């Protein structure tokens, strides 16, 4: 996940600034592309099947986050599933309610991309192709980072600078070509 996001987010930031399309809509369109390639209906698919809320899983995750308890982690996992279910809207009525509520509270522009659209946004077609190429490159990158991390763990020394990137846009995203 770190490899993919740290590779893609600078480009996504450039896409946002170039097109005005929100981060969530660009990622939603990329999710659609990946699901369609696997013959999954993106409008009906609940993508939280891999999340298993429990105190035991919370105990595994909590040490990675300062000030979070296993109970808070479990609650977060339950909330993630709940909100994904809220935003899963294959039917007209629920879609109208969701989008109407978003407009009512002034959050439509930032949030509508969290609900899978019925049809792809044609403005995102080329962006998704670029993200697919970056996705393909992130897999070997992740494998290499894992090896570098293990080497650091077992042999000491400094982490390579690649580990200092964040999930954000980073530096020089403005110079990227789409």
Language model region names:
Residues 1:
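Long, contiguous binding/interaction regions
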């Amino acid at each position: 996940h770190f490899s993919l996001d740290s590779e893609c987010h600078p480009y996504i930031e450039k896409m946002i600034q170039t097109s005005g399309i929100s981060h969530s809509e660009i990622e939603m369109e990329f999710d659609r592309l990946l699901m369609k390639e696997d013959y999954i209906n993106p409008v009906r698919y609940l993508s939280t099947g891999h999340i298993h809320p429990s105190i035991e899983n919370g105990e595994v995750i909590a040490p990675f986050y300062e000030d979070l308890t296993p109970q808070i982690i479990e609650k977060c996992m339950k909330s993630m599933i709940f909100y994904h279910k809220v935003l899963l809207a294959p039917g007209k009525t629920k879609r109208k309610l969701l989008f109407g509520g978003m407009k009512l509270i002034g959050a439509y522009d930032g949030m509508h991309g969290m609900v899978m659209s019925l049809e792809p946004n044609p403005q995102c077609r080329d962006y998704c192709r670029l993200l697919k190429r970056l996705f393909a490159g992130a897999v070997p990158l992740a494998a290499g980072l894992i090896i570098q991390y293990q080497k650091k763990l077992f042999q000491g020394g400094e982490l390579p600078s690649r580990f200092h990137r964040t999930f954000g846009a980073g530096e020089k995203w403005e110079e990227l070509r789409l």
